[in-house]
Amino acid sequence: MTTPGHVATPDTRLSSARRLIGVDAARGVALIGMMSVHINPAVAPDGDTSTTYLIASGRSAALFAVLAGVGLALASGGPTPRRGRALAAAMAATLARATVLGVVGLLLGAFDSGLAIILVYYGLLFVVAVPFLGLGPRLLFPLAAMAAALTPVISQWLRQSMPPPSYGNPVVESLADPVGLFSELAVTGYYPVLTWSAYILAGLAVGRLALGEAKTATGLLLGGAVLAAATWAVSWLLLNPAGGLETLAAAGSGSSPIAGRPLDVALTTSFYGTTPTTSWWWLAVVAPHSGSPFDLLHTIGTACFVLGAMLLLARVARAAVWPLAAIGSMTFT
């Protein structure tokens, strides 16, 4: 039964369809980017970072995480967050999805695929998102910004006194050590939920916008581009004119997975989830999967840029984005 204030007109149905196609297309871009990073080498034969990694490393995974937040927002009311029993039902559904993701992720972790399985991390991320499902963008955007700025600092402080991660995938047997499992999922692992909370909050905030409107898509495109460029530029200034690179070269990377790599290559490939703890200057990098404030803000910006571009393309060239949307609609999250 439709109330007079929510009549489904042809225009609103078309707007909703465009929105969903654009979101699915952006998810397709993320999936292709993640597959490209897994398939192609990080370093080219000449010793430089490969083009695939320069473009997609870190950015595609961040896009996927932001879109997970967008999906949760759309499932819980879109621009109008649900209230009362409807909100409670959305929260319960999200917890159920989190459980499924966690169980499937633990089972997949038993296979020696050579890939970092993200599903268990996503399960915990969805649990983290539950208390925020009733909020609107005016609160969610500042919360996402605070998470991006503060959680890397908290992570850097915590990890100075924590054991190094296993760099293995969580498996069912990991449940026998719940404290160790939680610390790796939340702080030290490949996709640490502490810092990745910025992505899910940013996605929730974006999903609360009127994504079917052209001005929203344009705002995401332009705002994302500005955020990505600005954070990259500030990081460059800190690392170069301000002397950050020299400090990092002197401090070294300790037992981090990037140890032994030339610094310029390490900064453009992958940090495997966290920064080294040998210097606080590591928080100034914008390196893929470093979880620094600049990495989080830069990749949130690129995610918004891609989503805005796909939403606009869905308006003017719907057939062109259908292949990407078809790919994106098949993802598990």
Residue map of PLM features:
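Alpha-helical transmembrane segments and their immediate juxtamembrane cytosolic regions
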Residues: 1-333
